[in-house]
Amino acid sequence: MVKVVIVNGRPGCGKTTFEQICQDICFPFTSHIGFSPDHSLAISLCSTVDFVKHIATLCGWDGTKSLENRRFLSDLKGLLTTWNDVPFKKIQERVEALMFDRKIDWILFVDCREPAEIQKLKERLNATTVLIRREEVEYDEVSNHSDADVFYYDYDLTIFNNSDIIHLEDEARKFIEYMKKEEVPHYVNAD
């Protein structure tokens, strides 16, 4: 079973930190996959811009996330989405690859910013949506519509990251326990 979790939040809100804490709670296996001690739950991380970043690197992008580079990545993702829905197809391929491991239940964290893309992932992959909020970054300057439109979606869950790492770890533990529940939506291949 694969439970897809769409994660969003403004730059610097702690999305990656939250995801990594969730991995650590489920026992770290590698930098991208975390298994629980009983080996019945695994966590994998990806983003709708992973493939976009690969293409950007081929075009000379140096991997930095300046305002100009964030705008470039956002625009490139928009082009790939309009052309052939490439970012969604790459996420769907990832989910279907995880479906082959029937001995383990997966939580796949997918970082995604655009409300329309979030809704598409939610509908097509039966995903749960999570917003990470951190007050100190909510009014920072952004360079692109993807970062600016973070709050224009009604998320299933909101996690507040306004305190210290211990508080965020507690929120991550609660989240993992919630995701273990059977009634949480999961992906079912239509084939």
Where are the regions that the model predicts?
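Small-molecule kinase domains that catalyze NTP-dependent phosphoryl transfer to phosphate-bearing small molecules
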Residues: 11, 123-124, 128-191
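Surface-exposed amphipathic alpha-helices with a cationic face
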Residues: 99, 119-123
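Extreme N-terminal starter segment of soluble prokaryotic enzymes
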Residues: 1-5, 43
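ATP-dependent small-molecule kinase phosphotransfer cores
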Residues: 35-105, 113
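Conserved phosphoryl-transfer catalytic core
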Residues: 23-40
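Conserved lysine of the Walker
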Residues: 15
